[in-house]
């Protein structure tokens, strides 16, 4: 090996200002072994420390689930918590009475979209927004609702506000659990565009 | 690799990978963030700085304060304090459960604690233990909460109640987060050092308020002028070697005032989703009104 | 398959080298001037750290303006400019082709210097952008980009017109650096300064730009120099081209991700990805160093004792910087060294120790060949080397150890901050000031050396122009220059 790396002396001695050449000796196998081991280590490291490449996972928390789980007040009454969120996020458009505004924002009180057996469609509307014509209680509406998935970032909060909507102003539908909210968020949270009424009606009301 | 085109294609692919990894992906994730409603504050967070503070940020940038000061609080861990909020009806079994949760308590101590609910029954537990204790109390009729407490040298040093996250800097342009701590961290300095005069003196000459400081002086932010009849109300109370000559006073220029406004606007004093902690009523003096409204 | 270049005898180089004379001397002399200015700014900043009232009354020389001014002067004024000069020379030599359109190169170089000057003055005037490595205000950046299109364009055309089609490993590195720089520079300028992205995305893109600049652009120029000059001086061939290829691809793909330590205000995936890539970069560096070690193993004296010293300093610093970055990226270590003097220490090793020493070696070795004049005082060059080496190592070691102590103090919440700064890091800062003084002296000697060479090369011409010809020695010198090798 070392004999090969010594300079090949051509007929004359290498001149002072000679341009270097290079050999293409066979690469030692150990290089590939180490490279593969490093790649394996790298994958493992990213698995444990990268927080699932999630934008909400910082510092000592390992995953989105952990962050969502440790939120203070997670044990509170969800309806009360939902009321707080409704007041801050939804009330400006849908009003404190849940009646909305004619021609602009559909009502939530007594709405056939809200009083379904499961919260699947409502969760998706809150997460991604809604655009285009829809029929609520027989009336036609054509409005745009912005996506709120980022504004209501935690699944517990999302479940709370949906539970509140489904149990106030005379609505008597089921509570939405944080697990259901998490499941729907996982499926459609990154959708990036609003739903249309037709797309939603094609989906089941129960969360899968 | 003797072909120029092969090399070029390879370099192009590497550029694409690099771009996607650290330019496109962060832009998709972080660049599209918007303000968020924070329940504890009852409003959107963060709110934009006032006009004078924005100009102060410009002074901060131009003077290069970010070369010595960071605005980033780090967090290295978290633990929980278990709080008994409501003992419920079955106090005897709850007392026993409290003793199980905190084995260092005698029966008398546990009884006292239960009587004084809401009260902390155990401090500083890790997540597994916190989950275990919550499960203990699940069907007992008592209400127990696990309150998260962030840990870290920055937090214990009093630089802030939680780590800083991307949401805190949404309105900052340019970001002046800094990466050297030759001076203390400033992310929460507006909550920590609230005295305007202290800041002005510190900027004029740090030795007036901090002996032995290595921070340079910034006298060019101030004006040394003749006392015109009555001393100006803005004049700095300088003494000893820092006092100006007889009959002169030092007043801050608009740059100094706006810089201090900016520093006083630097606050990290509410939890956010990514960095939770228990927010107590006392921390939000300005938002007390919205807090009482929620009680309805 | 052995790929030995044909051994051209020295007299054949003269026409190739000569085509490049004026632009090289121009680039090199401007570069060393910027190094001097940068080290003066750095020295002022360092003095301010223990003498806060030093030059306090002027807003143009605050600590916060001197530090970015020094960094930008050294990166854009010295390192990139000397880097362009070095890579053009290597491209011509390895491709055995004359420089294409040297006149445009001169225009490009002038524009570059004007851009850097405007940028530095802008930083001092308070218009810094606040972005690390890109503090020059927005109005200076287009000038730099325009200058680069000329310089980079000429380099690429020269590369394309090469006579020897086989590529030596250094040429891959040069090619990659030439493409990488305008890409990251324009992207960073647009996304950070032109139309800034929102929030902490700026931190990630800034880190991406800084890593790309350090590891890929400047790092590749430095590596190209090491792989070209060390075998050249040792009169050997590079041990294994495949090892170079491996290192090339690893550094190219992963290099721009390295260097963002975990613990900043960013989601954890950014720091974690950066850590993994820093380790890959360190591994690639080990492979490179091994390759060079095998190249010179068992060899005799090198054809230039001082040149090889610069190159060994460069290699050792580059390897140390890569290994230390990987070590510091681990979460437990990053907790200690993040936000401390450790990071400027790494920067000194990388920028001054590795890239700087490599470029100084290049200047030392190729300016005489290009200009046709020898250095007038080898003793001054020895002094330059020793003051530079000792100065850089003093600063780097002071910052690295001081940074560790700094970090340990920061992680101890019971230790008051003033104690950390006063007792902990003050002695290290004093040590670094001494080091920076030595580097400034080295830069001064360097400027003296290069100016002497410049004068001796062109004094005949200049004096002819001014009608002062016919003064014995001078015209005699210019006569002998034309015939010399």
Give the residues covered by each predicted segment.
Chain C
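Hydrophobic alpha-helical transmembrane segments of multi-pass integral membrane proteins
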Residues: 1-485
